[in-house]
Regions:
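Hot-dog-fold acyl-thioester-processing enzymes
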Residues: 1-44, 100-125
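HotDog/MaoC-like acyl-thioester-processing domains
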Residues: 53-55, 66-125
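Hydrophobic beta-strand-centered segment that forms part of the acyl-chain substrate-binding groove
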Residues: 23-74, 87-91, 97
Length: 125
């Protein structure tokens, strides 16, 4: 909570991070990181706050891969408030890069990972 009794803006970013980690587990990103040292790294973040959130409330965070490039990707987020009847309280875009942590540089997204992401996206619609 901040001084105005709202959920602080940084909390929204943590919620998105948690949702992103669940997404990455679902498409095999975490296994790739453990086995090959290749994984996602955050390059940028844009958040639009549409309404304040106060305690108590329950949030629903929707996460989707909105773009897959050669070595980069974008993820979209919608955060909805139960107390506000499911209304959107924030939307966001995360800009990420697939990174080879051993080599210290971006690396192309493998066909296997791309297929898993597309499969996950198809199952969510």
């Amino acid at each position: 909570m901040d001084a105005l009794n709202h959920v602080n803006h940084t909390v929204f970013i943590r919620w998105m991070e948690t949702a992103r980690m669940h997404y990455f587990v679902s498409c095999g990103f975490t296994t790739l990181l453990e086995e090959e040292g290749i994984g996602p790294i955050l390059a940028g973040l844009k958040v639009d706050y549409h309404a304040p959130v106060t305690f108590p409330d329950a949030m629903t965070i929707q996460t989707t891969m909105t773009r897959i490039g050669n070595s980069s990707f974008d993820m979209g987020y919608r955060i909805a408030s139960s107390a506000r009847g499911g209304d959107t309280v924030a939307t966001a875009t995360v800009y990420g890069v697939v990174f080879d942590y051993k080599a210290g540089k971006p690396t192309p997204i493998s066909d296997e990972l791309r297929s898993k992401v597309l499969e996950l996206e198809a199952s969510e619609t």
